[in-house]
Amino acid sequence: MLLIGLTGGIGAGKSSVSAALADRGAVVIDADAIVKELQSPGTEVFAEMVERFGVGIVADDGTLDRAAVADVVITDPQALADLGAIVHPRVHAEIERRIAEQSETANVVLLDIPLLAEAGWPGLLGTIVVDLD
């Protein structure tokens, strides 16, 4: 199995690359989608976030108010670190679970992880390609 890491900022073209490779048979594991799943109401992550940051991060419909979370963590380095401690280990574990699930059947698995280098993933990958303008 070829394991490819894809990273880049907003508007960098990650979605286009992911879609093109998926059209050619690659299995795409999207970290942002996993984060949203893990932060759904009723999950441990959601409960821990509400416990840490308060009910002000819950929207009227009971879902996570991402803008409210951003308002809290943007100016508070400790809050940002706490958010990372709640979310990142679970995302990492879920990505590893999905990789293992695909290891016997997939030829190519693409990890779409916006914070690939910052999250400590490069050691998992056999090849890293960087394109600088």
Language-model-detected regions and their locations in the chain:
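Residue-level recognition of specific faces of alpha-helices
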Residues: 9, 17, 37, 72, ...
